[in-house]
Design a protein with these regions (language model features):
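N-terminal "arm"/small-domain region of PLP-dependent enzymes with the aminotransferase-like
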Residues: 28-67
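Active-site C-terminal subdomain of aminotransferase-like
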Residues: 48-49, 226-263
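Active-site phosphate-binding strand-loop segment of PLP-dependent enzymes
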Residues: 149-205, 220
Length: 263
């Protein structure tokens, strides 16, 4: 009772409000909310989430087809463009894991029997190649020894061997911690094989490492909500360049999936 008396005295609760004496001013909730004590989560992801972010998730459910939802979703798409420094891109927000972005790339940006160059620095590069093969494309891997990354000369030689529809890069492979020099790789691709799409797996890097999607010439960037973005798991996030969208629109392969197709 003493707490409520103090809140009433400072004008932070009001008997005439819809919630009666229990309607607490939002600033009080924001300042007083604290998540329960727990063991510190020290893994690459999901990461620790701030009290403010958790409280924001306490918002009531909204109808996804309501007028109120439209500006919220639109603002979220614009924020993705800012995070990736990609004002010309088409953002996507989909319920799912970060690796769902692999499927989105394989479904929407390849034709049957396309060749794809996969730069591998660990487990997730290997798995990306496996995903690509599942959808009927042919991955060729440039595999670096554990703890290192493919050299620029190895990448250039591989690009000259055949015509690749796309090259995939794991920006940071969680299994090894190796950081790829994405800007350097995109410069090689532009010089040696300019028609090849650049696909970047940024699940472990977006929000933590420098990325300039438009300036570097990245065609498709995939990531997730639970690492550098700093919110709970559950969202597969991605952006496609105008060139990637044109590639999608000109595909001739029959749509093989429903929920992962951009149409």
């Amino acid at each position: 009772m003493e707490r409520w008396s103090s809140l009433r005295h400072h004008g932070l609760v009001h008997p005439a409000s819809p919630g009666g004496w229990g309607a607490v001013h939002p600033t009080v909730i924001m300042s007083s909310f604290k998540q329960a004590d727990h063991k510190l989560l020290m893994i690459p992801g999901p990461i620790e989430v701030s009290d403010d972010v958790l409280l924001a998730n306490a918002h009531p459910s909204m109808a996804h087809v309501s007028p109120d939802f439209v500006p919220v979703f639109g603002e979220s798409l614009e924020m993705l463009r800012k995070v990736a420094d990609a004002p010309s891109s088409q953002p996507f927000i989909i319920s799912g894991s970060g690796t769902l972005g692999w499927d989105l790339a394989a479904v929407n940006l390849r034709e049957t029997d396309d060749d794809v160059l996969v730069l591998t620095t660990g487990y997730f590069g290997d798995s990306f190649a496996e995903c690509i093969a599942t959808y009927g494309a042919h991955p060729t891997q440039v595999v670096a020894p554990v703890g290192s990354r493919p050299s620029e000369s190895e990448i250039e030689i591989a690009l000259k061997q055949k015509k690749y529809k796309a090259v995939t890069i794991t920006h940071v492979d969680t299994s090894t911690g190796i950081l790829m020099d994405v800007e350097a790789v995109t410069k090689i691709v532009k010089r040696v094989s300019p028609d090849t799409l650049v696909i970047l797996d940024g699940v472990c890097s977006v929000g933590s490492e420098e990325i300039h999607m438009d300036a570097w010439g990245i065609d498709y960037l995939l990531f997730a909500s639970q690492k550098g973005i700093g919110i709970p798991p559950g969202l597969s996030l991605s952006l496609a360049s105008p060139r990637a969208m044109k590639t999608f629109e000109s595909r001739t392969t029959r749509r093989a999936r429903f929920n992962t197709c951009w149409t």
